[in-house]
Design a protein with these regions (language model features):
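Low-complexity, flexible helical/coil segments
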Residues: 12, 38-42, 66-71
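An N-terminal amphipathic alpha-helical segment
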Residues: 1-24
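Sterically constrained small-residue positions within well-ordered secondary structures
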Residues: 23, 43, 55-57
Length: 71
């Protein structure tokens, strides 16, 4: 699944991302594109046991790849 949150104002990117996370099954991958690094999202992901990777893009946006782990 892929979400493009560029151009959206807070808290909409976070809300869209959390909703998509709820729909994920174990092993699923979600890729989001944000204008900013979603620092509050990282805390949420760590608390819920998701793994993630953050990449800076050439256009200045951030690509975050999230994987739902078991447990």
């Amino acid at each position: 699944m892929r979400l493009d949150n560029r151009g959206l104002q807070p808290p909409e990117p976070m809300q869209r991302t959390l909703k998509a996370l709820e729909e994920m099954n174990i092993g699923d991958k979600l890729t989001i594109i944000n204008d900013r690094k979603p620092m509050f999202l990282f805390e949420e992901l760590e608390q819920k046991g998701y793994s993630y990777e953050v990449n800076s893009r050439e256009d200045g946006a951030f690509e975050i790849i999230i994987i739902k782990k078991e447990g």
